[in-house]
UniProtKB/Swiss-Prot annotation:
The entry's keywords: ATP-binding, Nucleotide-binding, Nucleotidyltransferase, Transferase
Gene that encodes the chain: cysD
E.C. designation(s): 2.7.7.4
Self-association state and partner proteins as the record states: Heterodimer composed of CysD, the smaller subunit, and CysN.
Protein source organism: Escherichia coli O6:K15:H31 (strain 536 / UPEC)
The name this protein goes by in its record: Sulfate adenylyltransferase subunit 2
Amino acid sequence: MDQKRLTHLRQLEAESIHIIREVAAEFSNPVMLYSIGKDSSVMLHLARKAFYPGTLPFPLLHVDTGWKFREMYEFRDRTAKAYGCELLVHKNPEGVAMGINPFVHGSAKHTDIMKTEGLKQALNKYGFDAAFGGARRDEEKSRAKERIYSFRDRFHRWDPKNQRPELWHNYNGQINKGESIRVFPLSNWTEQDIWQYIWLENIDIVPLYLAAERPVLERDGMLMMIDDNRINLQPGEVIKKRMVRFRTLGCWPLTGAVESNAQTLPEIIEEMLVSTTSERQGRVIDRDQAGSMELKKRQGYF
């Protein structure tokens, strides 16, 4: 393939497909982490392209916290059924028994128990030795220094000082028993690339990414969309309908909306061209403590 003749999106596509095929061939029991967001949708689309006309040679895994938007759950089930994917859903039973939730226990504890520990439980339960994730280097500074093949010890911990070189698209996947890797095929993509590719390939996404009138309240400088009745309003708080959309999706109490009128993909792309803020500015888990994301990744977060 002549790389010089490819557009930058086709070059990124080819690189990602190469990585996905490499992992499928090299590891005995891979899995694709499916968080239902735009990056997961692109990664799933690339995986389907990589093995077309066959089916995916690995399952999808959703680590469920019980606090995703209802539209995300509907989209997840519809997508898995439409594409004939094997979908595994894991929810930390200990966290459920303890009644862990972001309002009572805070974002750090909720994320640690329901997401990090839940993910490690699922990986151990099924014995996966490689897990695809949709993280990109432009999202956050700790992800910017992480390799495409991110090695984890037998406790799923990441050591940023112990990473392997990746020269000329050559990846060293050798691991010892009990170790595993997290693989990030979208590492070199940007948010703008993701949106342009979604438009180019007509990839289905959760409607929450498109602007619409939604019930929100402002709390701690964040526009929180009220998705169900599990919220207790604080004195002076009022729920109002506002024109908002989401740049990133997660647990609804921890994911801030942004005011926007972008109701189509071209309008989102145009909006991104002038944006000066990170898409993850609305994610509470990224700023609940100093060096938050790197600390979470060292503990086993994806």
